[in-house]
Amino acid sequence: MPASSRKYPYVGFEPEREAGKDILFVEGITKTVDGVKVLDNVSFIANKGDKIALVGENEAGQTALFKILTGEMEPDAGSFKWGVSTSQSYFPQDNSAFFEGFDEDLICWLRQYSEDTTETYLRGFLGRMLFSGDEVYKPAKVLSGGEKVRCMLSRMMMTHANVLLLDQPTNHLDLESIQTLADGLARFPGNLLFSSHDHQFIDEIANRIIELPLGQPGCLDRTGTYEEFLEWKHNR
């Protein structure tokens, strides 16, 4: 049988430096969005090595928390503090702002986020996400949803951050790409905070689960797998 010629993406996140013991402190964060209190006195401490999945139906609360932790949004109350040795890279659920109005090609798009601006270097990261040959000269503004996600992952890999924040990263990805992303995040030696509705994706990566229940203060926080979290929640 001939070998398959199909190519698969490669996702590998390599931190430039290891984070210290202190990762993230969240204290009493509260936020109302469009008249709905989506975060109510949320507190937790992220420890070194934590790969935290944000789960549940409160997607607006999850996105608000990501935006607060990355400085895009101010909390109504509460505070947070990143450890001094941490560096963060963020994958937003809505990436349109990264591409709207950008008339140049993918090489130029990625060059905005890189200290090394050589085409060979940038091609390497785009190539991991299956942009090869003349595809790297495609205008960034005409990309499909899946292609934009692949570009955002190329950008994240290039940052060499030791803390990754990903808000619904599996949207627009096919099954092979989702599995490749799961493998890359499972291998990642740093800290993760991510949201997903994909149970298998969560199970392959997370070692801690946090749910932000809508209409209730605080959060449900449990170390372990998603299955263990669901069993614990059921028996509370």
Regions flagged by a language model, labelled:
Residues M1-I23:
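Coiled-coil termination/hinge junctions
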Residues E16-R236:
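ABC ATP-binding cassette signature C-motif
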